[in-house]
C-alpha cells in the first residue's frame, strides 16, 4: 500500500522595478507491505509484512565492549570477540546474538521525501537565480574498506575521521568511540549491519546560483547584436547534512564513487 503526494508551486510578483519569482516543489511518499509471499516467523519483526519497502534492518548496537569480563557476562556473539568490538542487543532474549536479533532500524534506504525551492529576481539589467534541493526520511549504512581499514589483510590509507576516533587499548577506551578497534584481517562481528553504522541520509544543498547582467539594448544594437549577457554560475556550492564523510547525495555506502563536483563558471551569452 503506497500513498503520498507530488506538487509544485510558483509565485510571481512585481515589487517596484523588481520582478520576483518564488518556487517550490516536493514529492513525498510512504508505504506499507500489506501482502508478501513469505513464511511465517516466530518473530514478527523478521517479516516484511507490515513494514515499509526498502526498510533498513540490522542489529541494535549498544556501544563497545570495555573488557573481557563484560564480554563473558553478555550474550554470546561468537568467538574472537575482544574489548573494543561492537556489542549488540539480544532482542529475542535467547542468549545468542544472531540473525534473529536483526530488526527494522532507521528509515528506508530510499528517500521518502524529495524537495526543492528557489527564488529568481530581475532588476533592470541584473538577474539572479538561486535553487536549493534536498532529500529526507532515508537511512543508509556505511561500510567497506573506507570505514573498515585493513579488512581481509589489505594495505592502504585510513580516513582522517578514523584516526584518533577509534577504540584503542590504553589510548582511547571510550565505550562510545566513533569507530571500534582496528583489526588486521576480517572482523565479521564489527562488519555487521547495525545501528552503529546507520546514518541519516537527509541533506539540503545549494544546488545552483546564477548571477547575470544583460547589457542594455542601446549599446548592443550598435554592435549589430540582439543581446549580450554576462553571467557567473556556481553548482553544488554548499551542503547541509549531519553526515560529513562524503557527499550524501551519492547514496554511497563507502564513498568510493566519484563525487559531484563543485563548479564555478564565468560565461558570456551573445544573441545574433
Feature locations, PLM:
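Extracytoplasmic gating/loop element in the C-terminal half of outer-membrane beta-barrel translocons
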Residues: 135-229
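Hydrophobic, lipid-facing positions within transmembrane beta-strands of outer-membrane proteins
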Residues: 3-7, 113-119, 126, 206-209, ...
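C-terminal beta-signal and terminal closure region of outer-membrane beta-barrel proteins
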Residues: 1-2, 43-69, 162, 168-174, ...
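Membrane-embedded beta-strand positions of outer-membrane beta-barrel proteins
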Residues: 7, 22-24, 130, 230-232, ...
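Outer-envelope beta-barrel architecture signal
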Residues: 16-22, 113, 124-126, 202, ...
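Conserved small-residue
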Residues: 12-109, 149, 157-160, 167-172
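Repeated loop/turn-to-beta-strand initiation elements of outer-membrane beta-barrel proteins
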Residues: 5, 17, 125-129, 218-219
Amino acid at each position: 500500500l503506497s500513498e503520498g503526494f507530488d506538487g509544485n508551486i510558483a509565485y510571481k510578483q512585481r515589487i517596484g522595478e523588481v520582478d520576483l519569482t518564488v518556487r517550490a516543489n516536493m514529492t513525498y511518499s510512504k508505504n506499507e507491505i500489506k501482502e508478501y509471499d513469505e513464511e511465517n516467523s516466530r518473530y514478527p519483526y523478521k517479516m516484511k509484512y507490515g513494514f515499509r519497502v526498502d526498510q533498513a534492518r540490522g542489529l541494535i548496537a549498544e556501544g563497545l565492549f570495555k573488557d573481557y569480563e563484560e564480554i563473558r557476562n553478555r550474550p554470546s556473539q561468537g568467538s574472537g570477540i575482544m574489548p573494543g568490538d561492537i556489542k549488540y542487543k539480544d532482542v529475542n532474549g535467547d542468549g545468542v546474538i544472531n540473525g534473529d536479533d536483526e530488526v527494522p532500524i532507521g528509515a528506508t534506504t530510499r528517500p521518502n521525501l524529495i524537495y526543492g525551492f528557489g527564488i529568481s529576481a530581475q532588476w533592470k539589467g541584473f538577474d539572479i537565480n538561486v535553487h536549493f534541493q534536498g532529500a529526507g526520511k532515508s537511512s543508509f549504512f556505511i561500510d567497506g574498506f573506507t570505514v573498515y581499514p585493513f579488512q581481509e589483510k589489505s594495505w592502504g590509507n585510513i580516513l582522517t575521521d578514523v584516526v584518533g576516533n577509534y577504540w584503542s587499548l590504553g589510548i582511547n577506551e571510550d565505550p562510545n568511540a566513533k569507530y571500534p578497534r582496528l583489526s588486521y584481517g576480517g572482523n565479521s562481528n564489527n562488519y555487521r549491519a547495525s545501528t552503529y553504522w546507520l546514518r541519516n541520509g537527509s541533506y539540503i544543498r545549494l544546488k545552483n546560483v546564477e548571477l547575470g547582467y544583460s547589457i542594455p539594448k542601446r549599446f548592443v544594437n550598435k554592435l549589430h547584436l540582439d543581446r549580450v549577457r554576462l553571467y557567473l554560475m556556481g553548482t553544488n556550492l554548499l551542503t547541509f547534512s549531519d553526515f560529513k564523510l562524503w557527499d550524501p547525495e551519492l547514496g554511497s555506502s563507502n564513498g568510493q564513487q566519484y563525487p559531484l563536483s563543485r563548479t564555478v563558471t564565468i560565461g558570456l551569452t551573445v544573441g545574433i
